[in-house]
Amino acid sequence: DRGLFWQKFSDFNEDGTVKTDVGVLIKVKQISCYGNDSYGGMSGRDIMALACGLYESCDFGYMHDRVQQCEYLAQGFYKAGVKGVVLPAGGHAVYINMDEFFDGKRDHTTFAGTGFSLELIRRYGIRVSELGDFSMEYDLKTPEQQAELANVVRFAIDRSRLTQEHLDYVIAAVKALYEDRESIPNMRIVWGHKLPMRHFHAFLEPYANEEK
């Protein structure tokens, strides 16, 4: 909405182009304080469910099961021959190092980890989080900062929702994708390259690995 508020509080260059979009600034603040504009609010019922979940998560039996599920998934990836599995697994998620997954053949600026997450949900309906080169803004960092970044994808395990059959499906899907990893596309940013927290609202498009 580029109405009076936007016109009054945005900054413009002399030629009339937008220098600072106040709408983007407000959205970034909203994401960091509350959540994305697509998340919706929480009803009283949801808040009570959250309180119950926090109480249950303090139970030792629950925590043990969480750790065991993460270990099962990580070991499943490892035994399937998938490279880059971060071991030992933690208590809420399993991580795969994308540099090792792609045998070091993908440049950091190709954002191949995002391509991996795209193909995993497109082919198998599995949603993961890329927490590497794209999310951590590798291309905008200094060489010293780049050396400290981990190029990983996170498989967070939903609490009290996934059975062993679910995890076996994820293992089989990642194994199949690993064996076909040469076909996984790279990604380029088409809008929002320098936006704060760009992984929430930038736009990307895939391109073939052979294309430069």
Name every feature range the model reports, one short phrase each:
Residues 1-113, 118, 134:
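Active-site C-terminal subdomain of aminotransferase-like
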Residues 5-13, 125, 139, 208:
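Compositionally biased, intrinsically disordered low-complexity regions enriched in proline and serine
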Residues 57-58, 123, 135-212:
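PLP-dependent enzyme catalytic core of the Aspartate aminotransferase-like
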Residues 72-80, 115-126, 171-180:
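Generic non-transmembrane alpha-helical segments
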Residues 92, 126, 153:
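A broad, low-specificity signal marking well-ordered, structured residues that form hydrophobic/aromatic
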